[in-house]
Amino acid sequence: MSGNGFGHLFRFTTFGESHGPAIGCVVDGVPARIPLTEADIQHYLDQRKPGQNRFTTQRREPDEVKILSGVFEGLTTGTSIGLLIENTDQRSKDYGEIKDTYRPGHADWVYQQKYGIRDYRGGGRSSARETAMRVAAGAIARKVLDALAPGLSIRGAMVQMGPHAIDRSRWDWAELGNNPFWCPDGAAAKSWEEYLDTIRKSGSSIGGVVEVVASGVPVGLGAPVYDKLDADLAKAMMSINAVKGVEIGDGFAAAALSGEENADEMRMGNDGQVGFLSNHAGGILGGISTGQDVVVRLAVKPTSSILTPKQSVDAKGNNVEVSTKGRHDPCVAIRAVPVAEAMMACTLADHLLRSLAQPRLS
């Protein structure tokens, strides 16, 4: 199985399965002498880890990361950074009844068809458990960005749960820590609690929309034609489990705009720098960053692991009904927020290093 790595100069490769002994990753391309500790990585892992409230899976994994290589006396050495997280709360028996049955909406059947073998315990390699290592890699990417692009910040939020979207006029980043949804609209978050409680108690699930904003991005990241920044961001976000759609800036809404409405007009500022009067493009033009906020939204489907019986087939070709047991998120979009932030960080770090490797000559 190929396709376990992401990036070019800043590159990470993940390994491990949901119910295996551990998950891990190897991060390459990190410059030497960048301060890095396990606590730096743990800070972001704690934002993603399961079992923190009733709205996420009750699988309780501490997600304690160990740095195995590439760091000496608190500084990166420039060599590969090896990271490991041990799995401690697997319940493989929850999946015994479906080991020969394909769960609708999951990767079970296609894995079996492609490889002739699959780890049925929690989805194996296709499990969102893998995303913990993306968050770990993203924490390192943030340290690279801190060193090479001071002032660059990345923040993510959940802006829609099912059909219920936030009121953008009430957007307040300070609200993110006041609710379990990473929601910037406090009033919306309160209504979501009751809504998701109903979904959760019924054994069902619901999707959502996540928005990630990177501020302070330098001008000039990305390159035509096939190395566009937005193309790589789309790939990064689409690679996250359960993501079924990605848009940059106004995205699909731009299709309904006129040319006059959509174009981000430009003016010279009092500081002598070029400024924009709007940001419909989401901070990227021609695949190259403009210096404005880079804005990405992703649509996250509802998890297919629900109690409601669904029609499927088994390995012997019989028609069956499947009701998925185990511990699952009623809305996976919640924990997708720190994962999306991490993929934004990894993509920007990679493009920043690539840009520095090909400087413009005076």
Curated annotation (Swiss-Prot):
Pathway: Metabolic intermediate biosynthesis; chorismate biosynthesis; chorismate from D-erythrose 4-phosphate and phosphoenolpyruvate: step 7/7. It comes from the Bacteria. InterPro entries: Chorismate_synth (IPR000453), Chorismate_synth_AroC_sf (IPR035904), Chorismate_synthase_CS (IPR020541). One of its GO terms (cellular component) is cytosol. Its cofactor is FMNH2. Homotetramer. This is Chorismate synthase.
